[in-house]
């Protein structure tokens, strides 16, 4: 199963979300699931974090996921087309990010009010 974990966000609880998402990522069996870590910066930009972030938190119970920008930006494209849902932009190319389940580990504004969930539902 392809699982996307969303964390961070434009909220005063940004850091709390990073700690919570680290715990979630630590407890999903990466041998059975493909886990994509998607950080949302305090400015609202979405980035796909490298696999090394997942490995870091799974090896160290005190490690916290990063929210640093990467070369892979994530966008949400509404609709039901080939390039809809969560998509990765890298080197000027856009491709769908295979996703079966999104785990929104977002606290505070835009997370607990259902806004992000609504956006994802529109994107199918």
Each model region followed by its residue ranges:
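ATP-binding N-terminal substructure of ATP-dependent carboxylate-amine bond-forming enzymes
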Residues: 1-124
